[in-house]
């Protein structure tokens, strides 16, 4: 349901644009909150990690709806069960993982808003990578170019260390 100015005032459980490769659903776009925040929901299958990265513009807060989310926030590992919040301040690196056996589902808020556009653009890159249209090197370089525009820095060199700390991977 939208008001006359087209800003959302009610978003149902199955509403919001869904990005299938990333398994992210846009729930509250930044324009609905005067650019103050963006809210999305995302899922993470068992054994999957969101790589270490740092945001230079946004604070993030995750609320765990389902499963257990393992997080490395600035070097501190926390395991967040259902009902937990995980705060990831701007400028602090973080990585997120589903180290369990059940899917994880999270509500994520970015403040200020606008980061939903990164998800939209990265969905296209991830789709090309998943289909084999681009290789891993091009995937990383394209992701880096996109992320630079949005103030995100991925720390791929930390992936083996973080995977070991999360207890996942080879």
Residues of each region from the PLM?
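Hydrophobic small-molecule pocket/channel-lining residues, especially in calycin-type beta-barrels
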Residues: 48, 56, 69, 117-120, ...
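Short acidic-glycine-tyrosine-enriched beta hairpin
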Residues: 32, 75-93
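Ligand-binding loop in jelly-roll beta-barrel domains
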Residues: 70, 90-116
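Conserved short histidine dyad/triad with adjacent acidic residue
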Residues: 26, 40-55
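A hydrophobic, small-residue-rich beta->alpha segment in the mid-to-C-terminal subdomain
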Residues: 117-133
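Glycine- and acidic-residue-biased ligand/ion/polar-headgroup-sensing regions
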Residues: 57-69, 74
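A short, N-terminal "cap"/entry segment at the start of jelly-roll beta-barrel domains
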Residues: 1-37, 134-170
